[in-house]
Amino acid sequence: QNYAAKKGILCLMDMGHYHPTEVVSEKISSLLCFYDKLALRVSRPVRWDSDHVVIFDDELKEVAKEIIRNHAEDKVIIGLDYFDASINRLVAWTTGERSMEKALLYAALLPNEEMKKLQDNAEFSKLLYLQEHAKMLPFDAVYQEYLTRQGLEEDYFTPLHQYEEEVLSQR
């Protein structure tokens, strides 16, 4: 038993603090077997104290797939790290938030139930085919519709840059 289990507290997986060959996504399904809830600190692992802004990269997509495939949307508490001393914090925050949303949407759009069935039936050739096919599904069109329904523009940089020039620079 680890410290969190002994103390009855949440186990926190901090994506920014693992060996470069280790990834958090590979640990999620195992931890969910032992914990009712799991906390994630999602960041981009960089080996110095800057540039931790979350981006829509392969590991973020894998983390989201683990959450969605394990039906753990209510079991995994997601905290995002936006620290980067060299860029506008509002841009960092919005980039990170939208990247996490994209990853979860991407994972939710995958044919997860069909892939599970193929895995369970040892139909690995068809599973490989489906996994590769899924990479080209029209994710962006669905994301654009999501933004429209939320009343959001895809371009968040322009208004944030304008705010930086007109408001933040005056402080």
Regions found by a protein language model. Give the residues of each.
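Active-site-proximal segments of catalytic enzyme domains
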Residues: 1-2
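Histidine-acidic metal/acid-base catalytic patches
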Residues: 5-13, 19-171
